[in-house]
């Protein structure tokens, strides 16, 4: 909840389920013992990110074609140091090694140029209404 508005943030219970189903798809950065940034998301054969995916960790398919990114999170005090970018690069590298078709995430308008720097292409407004927000679907095809 420190990284996202309450309506958009995953609950502790949702994170527990995510860790249970796809712990290998969390990219973490620590400062000493403190978690300061992380990226997470599951793998699926579905090419588009849906609201259902945020809520149902059990939809993870380890052999799926697409790495979804549900959150790029950095605590406010550690933002603008490149930590999120490092984790995004690690997620991209892992997806390549695993033979995925690519990665998909959604973001608000102001972040489209940020994700474009990593090779993500804006595919237009997403069907997702997660947190009652308009999201752009971004895709990086490998």
Which residue stretches match the model-derived regions?
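Conserved GNAT acetyl-CoA-binding A-motif
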Residues: 88, 93-108
């Amino acid at each position: 909840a420190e990284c996202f508005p309450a309506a958009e943030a995953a609950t502790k219970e949702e994170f527990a389920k995510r860790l249970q189903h796809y712990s290998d798809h969390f990219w973490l950065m620590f400062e000493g013992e403190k978690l300061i940034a992380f990226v997470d998301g599951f793998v699926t054969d579905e090419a588009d990110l849906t609201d259902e995916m945020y809520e149902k960790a059990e939809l993870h398919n380890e052999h799926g074609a697409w790495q979804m990114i549900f959150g790029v999170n950095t605590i406010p005090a550690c933002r603008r140091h490149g930590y999120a970018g490092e984790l995004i690069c690690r997620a991209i590298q892992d997806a390549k090694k695993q033979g995925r078709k690519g990665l998909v995430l959604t973001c608000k308008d102001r972040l489209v140029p940020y994700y474009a720097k990593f090779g993500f292409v804006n595919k237009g407004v997403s069907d997702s209404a997660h947190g009652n927000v308009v999201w752009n679907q971004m895709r990086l095809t490998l």
